[in-house]
């Protein structure tokens, strides 16, 4: 078999949907977690500097921000592991589907994964059998999961519903910063609005960011315009937009995972007549 023919058969058997979804998932999660973390830090600095001088006014806000940042850490770790499992599931089920259709039976990765799941070669040496036995138990557990794509369909479906809420929440700070930026544009171009510049304000209390007794709690007129021109505000605004885009990319990847996994499961169940693999 020539090199080109071998590469062509590998490409034919590759689960392209799972590969694209995994890459999109890792990209989206990295963008959401990295930019979201820095955007929350920038928001904390803006509140402390311009909207309130009393620590008690934004003490609860800081706790909430830190809680979201810890959530981001957990999200990054979880999606890294789950994305790798979904990619392995894609190789595993795609090999079985190719076998049913009589195509190239499995990919090189699928063969390696199958060998790993079945235990692989035995260990050597005094501690070899013990290590091999422990590794076989882990692989056996992994094989049970990879052999049941319906579990991945259910988990990914629930995860997609949860991520829809995360996606909606990531749009809230973008909306707040966009309103503030629009107000600054009106202040910078007085001819575009009939209101006086002094009445154009950004009130953090209105969005529930600060309590109503916070002072000053809002910034108006030329002071607000000067804030919008700072690098901190512009950077934080763009970071929230990037985090929103990352959340959208992650949502698309999860939907792609659902479609690919559901298709493989349906083919294996209907055309494979329920054969376990």
UniProtKB/Swiss-Prot annotation:
Membrane topology: Multi-pass membrane protein
Lipid positions (O-palmitoyl threonine): 199
Keywords: Cell membrane, Disulfide bond, Lipoprotein, Membrane, Palmitate, Transmembrane, Transmembrane helix
Subcellular compartments: Cell membrane
Membrane topology, Cytoplasmic segments: 2-10, 89-151, 269-277
GO terms for biological process, alphabetical: axon development; central nervous system myelination
GO CC annotation, single: plasma membrane
Chief location category: membrane
Gene Ontology terms for molecular function: structural constituent of myelin sheath
UniProt key word Transmembrane: yes
Superkingdom, natural source: Eukaryota
Keyword Nucleus: no
Lipid modification (S-palmitoyl cysteine), residues: 6-7, 10, 109, 139, 141
Disulfide bonds: 184-228, 201-220
Ranges that cross the membrane: 11-36, 60-88, 152-178, 239-268
Entry's family note: Belongs to the myelin proteolipid protein family.
Function: This is the major myelin protein from the central nervous system. It plays an important role in the formation or maintenance of the multilamellar structure of myelin.
PANTHER family xref list: MYELIN PROTEOLIPID, MYELIN PROTEOLIPID PROTEIN
Listed name of the protein: Myelin proteolipid protein
């Amino acid at each position: 078999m020539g090199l080109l023919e071998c590469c062509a058969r590998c490409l034919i058997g590759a689960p392209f949907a799972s590969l694209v979804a995994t890459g999109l998932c890792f990209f989206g999660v990295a963008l959401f977690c990295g930019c979201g973390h820095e955007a929350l830090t920038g928001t904390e600095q803006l509140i402390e500097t311009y909207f309130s001088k009393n620590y008690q006014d934004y003490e609860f806000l800081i706790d909430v921000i830190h809680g979201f940042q810890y959530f981001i850490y957990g999200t990054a770790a979880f999606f890294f592991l789950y994305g790798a499992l979904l990619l392995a599931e894609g190789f595993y089920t795609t090999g079985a589907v190719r076998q049913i259709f009589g195509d190239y039976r499995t990919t090189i990765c699928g063969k390696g994964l199958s060998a790993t799941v079945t235990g692989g070669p035995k260990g050597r040496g005094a501690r070899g059998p013990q290590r091999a036995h422990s590794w076989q138990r882990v692989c056996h557990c992994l094989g049970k999961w990879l052999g049941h794509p319906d579990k991945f369909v259910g988990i990914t479906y629930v995860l997609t519903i949860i991520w829809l809420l995360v996606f909606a929440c990531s749009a809230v700070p973008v909306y707040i910063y966009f309103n503030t930026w629009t107000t600054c544009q009106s202040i910078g171009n007085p001819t575009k609005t009939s209101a006086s510049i002094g009445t154009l304000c950004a009130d953090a209390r209105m969005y529930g960011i600060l309590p109503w007794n916070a002072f000053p709690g809002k910034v108006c007129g030329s002071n607000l315009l000067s804030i919008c021109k700072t690098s901190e505000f512009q950077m934080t605004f763009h970071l929230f937009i990037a985090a929103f885009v990352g959340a959208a990319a992650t949502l698309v990847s999860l939907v792609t995972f659902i479609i690919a996994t559901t298709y493989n499961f349906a083919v294996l169940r209907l055309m494979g007549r329920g054969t376990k693999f």
